[in-house]
Regions:
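Phosphate- and other anionic-substrate recognition elements at nucleic-acid/protein interfaces
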Residues: 1-138
């Protein structure tokens, strides 16, 4: 199982993506649910990957830095964890300017259903692509 956290609109909303029992299951969470999500990942002996800005800080309304929290949480429990710089997923999948993550996700992984509003679909698609990308390294 891989947990992929993706910031949305710099407000610290997270799209989670994790592979379970041969499929990929994903959902949308906000920082108040972040610890619960990591507990779930730990319980399933999972791995964690987060895309974050160059400066290493994500601003959230709750004054929580989920990226730093995740790093401390994962290291403290010995869970495999990695950061990915913004843009890495687009480069890894060769996604052109003007093309959305949702379009790429539908092309590469048609079995995954993207639900919600277009913005939510885009964030979820990014989390799915990030999780698949991280599988190579985690």
């Amino acid at each position: 199982m891989i947990y992929a956290g993706v910031t949305a609109d710099n407000q610290g909303a997270f799209a989670l993506a994790y592979g379970m029992s041969g499929g990929l299951h994903y959902d949308l969470f906000t920082p108040d649910k972040f610890k619960d999500a990591l507990d779930k990942v730990e319980a399933m002996e999972g791995r964690c990957v987060i895309e974050m800005p160059e400066d290493g800080f994500i601003e959230t309304p709750e004054k929580v830095n989920p990226a730093v929290f995740a790093r401390m949480y994962c290291r403290g429990r010995g869970m495999p964890f990695m950061f990915v710089k913004p843009g890495s997923v687009r480069r890894a999948y060769n996604i052109k300017d003007g093309q959305t993550m949702a379009e790429e996700c539908r092309l590469r992984f048609p079995e995954i259903e993207l639900r919600g509003l277009p913005d939510q679909q885009e964030e979820t698609a990014k989390a799915v692509l990030l999780a698949k990308y991280a599988k190579r390294y985690l």
